[in-house]
Amino acid sequence: MSSGGLLLLLGLLTLCAELTPVSSRKRHPDCDKPPDTKICQTVVRAFYYKPSAKRCVQFRYGGCNGNGNHFKSDHLCRCECLEYS
């Protein structure tokens, strides 16, 4: 990916939290699902939202496409799963 593409991605990620009104943000339903730790392909570091801890936690994702509660970064996890209401 070019440096311009990376800057655009960073800008979009930053806007994720900034443009959504705090009072209307709801956690995505997939964020309540447990992490899928089955191994199907290469194991990579990922993050999932842990509702009991109210935070994102690192885990080993095996590439099985399990559910929507797996993210490439802690930032993306927090952006999608933290609830502001």
Curated annotation (Swiss-Prot):
<keyword id="KW-1220">Voltage-gated potassium channel impairing toxin</keyword>
<dbReference type="InterPro" id="IPR036880">
    <property type="entry name" value="Kunitz_BPTI_sf"/>
</dbReference>
<keyword id="KW-0638">Presynaptic neurotoxin</keyword>
<feature type="disulfide bond">
    <location>
        <begin position="31"/>
        <end position="81"/>
    </location>
</feature>
<dbReference type="InterPro" id="IPR020901">
    <property type="entry name" value="Prtase_inh_Kunz-CS"/>
</dbReference>
<feature type="domain" description="BPTI/Kunitz inhibitor">
    <location>
        <begin position="31"/>
        <end position="81"/>
    </location>
</feature>
<keyword id="KW-0632">Potassium channel impairing toxin</keyword>
<dbReference type="GO" id="GO:0004867">
    <property type="term" value="F:serine-type endopeptidase inhibitor activity"/>
</dbReference>
<comment type="similarity">
    <text>Belongs to the venom Kunitz-type family.</text>
</comment>
<feature type="disulfide bond">
    <location>
        <begin position="40"/>
        <end position="64"/>
    </location>
</feature>
<keyword id="KW-0964">Secreted</keyword>
<comment type="function">
    <text>Beta-bungarotoxins are presynaptic neurotoxins of the venom. The B chain is homologous to venom basic protease inhibitors but has no protease inhibitor activity and blocks voltage-gated potassium channels (Kv).</text>
</comment>
<keyword id="KW-0528">Neurotoxin</keyword>
<dbReference type="GO" id="GO:0090729">
    <property type="term" value="F:toxin activity"/>
</dbReference>
<dbReference type="InterPro" id="IPR050098">
    <property type="entry name" value="TFPI/VKTCI-like"/>
</dbReference>
<dbReference type="Pfam" id="PF00014">
    <property type="entry name" value="Kunitz_BPTI"/>
</dbReference>
<keyword id="KW-1015">Disulfide bond</keyword>
<dbReference type="GO" id="GO:0005615">
    <property type="term" value="C:extracellular space"/>
</dbReference>
<feature type="disulfide bond">
    <location>
        <begin position="56"/>
        <end position="77"/>
    </location>
</feature>
<keyword id="KW-0872">Ion channel impairing toxin</keyword>
<feature type="signal peptide">
    <location>
        <begin position="1"/>
        <end position="24"/>
    </location>
</feature>
<dbReference type="GO" id="GO:0015459">
    <property type="term" value="F:potassium channel regulator activity"/>
</dbReference>
<dbReference type="InterPro" id="IPR002223">
    <property type="entry name" value="Kunitz_BPTI"/>
</dbReference>
<keyword id="KW-0732">Signal</keyword>
<comment type="subunit">
    <text>Heterodimer; disulfide-linked. The A chains have phospholipase A2 activity and the B chains show homology with the basic protease inhibitors.</text>
</comment>
<keyword id="KW-0800">Toxin</keyword>
<protein>
    <recommendedName>
        <fullName>Kunitz-type serine protease inhibitor homolog beta-bungarotoxin B4 chain</fullName>
    </recommendedName>
</protein>
